[in-house]
């Protein structure tokens, strides 16, 4: 997959079929947009392309209220590639970019840089200065520049629009099953194995590992039945997020029992944990029985 951070990058493939957005989480709504782009690109012989922003625009415009992210930038790229996207133009978001009118943005990035033949927006998406760009602006500009412009409808779950905000809220409330349905996959916490208090064997009676989460949104405090990836093998595991009431420690942490001693030996290495099912908190003995 081609990943460019400059509109003048000579590696950019043209012509293209394009969508625009941050796409944090790559939930089912985002996936619907990606499928539309990939399908259209296959028909018109162009490169399926995503124009995105890094960092998140709100972290520049409204840093005090910027949302925690569901994915790292690298995780978003991996997901896009899996969905069939073959090119990403990741625009470094700055106040200068925010000051561009919708028309300037389209002409500079979508027309001049990517030679877009078709542009898809998610319903309600806006771009450009004061969020002035929308599907109506694109359709008006399409007459001049000769591209198609279309809007992809929302995806709903139980009558509620699926969005990155709704997914974050579900996770922050510990509703990992709801988040899984909105994402179309389990939500994973990925991070470095860190030094713990070495209580796994002598006190708890089973091997444990502590990780420092790499993902920005960590589910609410609780005990979750999970799966942990160690050396390319998934192990059933139990993960505790939050305080450690069983050992009298109030620090927020992510600790897991992965059914293999290898997890705890990987200090300084990455582990991936997929959140599957929430269950009630219990004492160490109860966790050992899962």
Question: What is the predicted role of each segment?
Answer:
Residues 75-87:
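A glycine-rich helix N-cap at a beta->alpha junction
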Residues 68-76, 100-106:
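Glycine-rich, highly charged phosphate/nucleotide-binding loops
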Residues 96-206, 229-231:
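Classical nucleotidyltransferase
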Residues 196-274, 279, 290:
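Phosphate/ribose-recognition catalytic cores of enzymes acting on nucleotide-derived substrates
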Residues 9-72:
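N-terminal catalytic cores of NTP/NDP-binding nucleotidyl/phosphoryl-transfer enzymes
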Residues 27, 80, 119, 179, ...:
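Residue-level signal for inorganic ion chemistry
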